[in-house]
Amino acid sequence: MDVRNCSFCGKSIEPASGFLYVRKDGSVLNFCSRKCKENMVKLKRVPRKVKWTNEYHRIKAMTKKA
């Protein structure tokens, strides 16, 4: 069973679900929902600046410790 993580929010994606997006340069992005895909591809948002992503919470915890 191959469980993948969302390229935007970091949530785990079950097999046979989610979106697979391939850029022109050949890099592959996995998304759990349309919300994540639109935020990264269309709106060009950075995951560390969006409050509901795992990346944001990870960086916030690091700065809180320091």
From Swiss-Prot:
Zn(2+) binds at C6, C9, C32, C36. The keyword RNA-binding applies. PROSITE patterns: RIBOSOMAL_L24E (PS01073). GO terms for molecular function: rRNA binding; structural constituent of ribosome; zinc ion binding. The keyword Nuclease does not apply. InterPro entries: L24e/L24_sf, Ribosomal_eL24, Ribosomal_eL24-rel_arc, Ribosomal_eL24-rel_N, Ribosomal_eL24_CS, TRASH_dom. GO terms for cellular component: ribonucleoprotein complex; ribosome. Binds 1 zinc ion per subunit. Gene3D superfamilies: Ribosomal protein L24e. Its cofactor is Zn(2+). It comes from the Archaea. Keywords: Metal-binding, Ribonucleoprotein, Ribosomal protein, RNA-binding, rRNA-binding, Zinc, Zinc-finger. A zinc finger (C4-type) spans 6-36. Pfam families: Ribosomal_L24e. GO terms for biological process: translation. Belongs to the eukaryotic ribosomal protein eL24 family. Binds to the 23S rRNA. Part of the 50S ribosomal subunit. Forms a cluster with proteins L3 and L14. This is Large ribosomal subunit protein eL24. It comes from Picrophilus torridus (strain ATCC 700027 / DSM 9790 / JCM 10055 / NBRC 100828 / KAW 2/3). The gene is rpl24e.
